[in-house]
Amino acid sequence: MMRNEVLHGYLIHHRKYREKSHIVHLFSQEYGRVDGILRQTPAPQYQPIRVQATGKSELKNFTQLEILHQPVFFHGDAFFAGFYLNEIVLRLCPLEEALPQTFRQYQVTLLQLQQLASHAQADLFLRQILRQFEHALLQELGYAIDFASDA
């Protein structure tokens, strides 16, 4: 149950709900993935946000959404990589379970995606940062690959 809790995180996905509302999926620092209804225009993806959350059910009520930094827009491979990150967070992260290492790695990965276009070996760099994120997520979920031993 959340009573006027402030959440810090990122908008992962949203879809229209009724005339002036959206169902949104957030990846928050405090509670991991949180789903809710937002009665205002959602923030762009990949932007750090702060939002007020209330509610007892799995679908919270979000109010007072605030974008914390200037918008970041990805192009080309960085756009598709960001979309991929959001999809695996949405599909793999359990509802309302904090994943602090994964959240930190998500932030690091977004920063690295901003630098992708200026990187000398962009394709190799992209694969590396995506694998680092996947490894952090799987490790925190308890499905990490043990590279120390072989079968």
List each language-model region with its residue ranges.
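Non-catalytic alpha-helical scaffolds and adjoining flexible linkers that form interface surfaces
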Residues: 1-22, 27-151
